Regions:
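Nucleotide/phosphate-binding catalytic cleft detector across ATP-hydrolyzing
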Residues: 1-18, 22-205, 223-225, 234, ...
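Glycine-rich phosphate-binding loop of actin/hexokinase-like ATP-binding domains
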Residues: 202-243
């Protein structure tokens, strides 16, 4: 293993159905993907949150080992996604009286924003903070620096999560001997990769349906306006299918092959197949699945 891991960028995502790791290298201004590995998260991650540290550590350790085998170097640091049921947004307003009319400085704005980070939440921490708008003496201003005023009010969107979300992940990676380069909020990283600046500017919502959770992120004027995580995902469909005479292990296969969200699905007798045959020979009417 002669190469240095500083040449590569490694990221790990801890999802409810799988833990995945990817390694790449910047080349000519683009990211070249060099290695990918994943492990099923059986009994260790629930609704995006690590609840069995030992099993999660074993999966992360296996993924790191697979990536190292391809890269031919030891991985000492990785970027890690932060997600899960507790991740959501919270709006807060910070007000300051400047006592006398004066120019608003960068330092004053930074102090107000820092105060929004420090608002106490029971068992929660602020992961990120997004300024929404400022009000200077009753006038709404996008950038108040340099404006004269006596009173300033800042509205911020705090993205918060339960404190154990980060601490459990930190414990897992410490056990694996891998430093966390940065914890990145997964829904926002996804949005940065799939949404254009024009879409964020004009206003849009991004919905990501995962195994145990669904996240919704709303943008307007290139600013994050809302984020919520709903405890509902694709696994709920599997649970519904499990009420049919289908083995739990086959529900995912049935869902992918025959599931359809459209009501105009062809259910005529000419449609093929009309039945799903289970591994033990039982037949399930396709109408029960769609």
């Amino acid at each position: 293993m002669a190469n240095s891991d500083k040449e590569f960028i490694v990221a790990v995502e801890l999802g409810s159905s799988k833990i995945s790791g990817i390694a790449g290298k910047k080349k000519d201004g683009t990211m070249q993907i060099l290695a990918y590995a994943e492990e099923k998260t059986v009994g260790c991650v629930k609704r995006g949150v690590v609840y069995n540290i030992e099993k999660t550590y074993q999966s992360v350790n296996n993924i790191i080992a697979k990536l190292e085998a391809v890269l031919k170097t030891k991985i000492s640091r990785a970027y890690v996604g932060l997600g899960g049921q507790s991740v959501r947004s919270y709006k807060c307003v910070i007000k300051r009286n400047l006592l006398t009319q004066s120019y608003i400085t960068n330092e004053a704005i930074d102090a107000i924003r820092q105060e929004s980070y420090e608002i106490p939440f029971n068992d929660y921490e602020v992961l990120e903070n997004f300024p929404q708008e400022y009000v200077v003496d009753s006038s709404i201003i996008a950038d108040p620096v340099g404006v004269m005023g006596t009173n300033i009010e800042g509205e911020f969107l705090d993205v918060i999560a339960k404190s154990n979300l980060r601490t459990n992940i930190e414990t897992v990676f410490a056990n694996a001997g891998v430093a966390i380069a940065e914890g990145l909020i997964s829904p926002l990283q996804l949005a940065n990769n799939v949404l254009t600046d024009a879409e964020k500017r004009s206003g849009c919502a991004l919905v990501d349906l995962g195994a145990d959770t669904t996240t919704l992120v709303v943008y307007k004027n290139n600013i994050v306006r809302y984020l919520v995580t709903i405890p509902l995902g694709c696994s709920n469909i599997n649970k519904d299918l499990a009420t049919l005479p289908i083995d739990d292990a086959e529900t995912e296969d049935v869902k992918l092959k025959y599931g359809d969200a459209c009501q105009d699905t062809d259910m005529s007798e000419e449609a093929d197949p009309q039945f799903y045959t289970t591994s033990d020979g039982r037949q399930i009417d396709r109408k029960s699945v769609v």
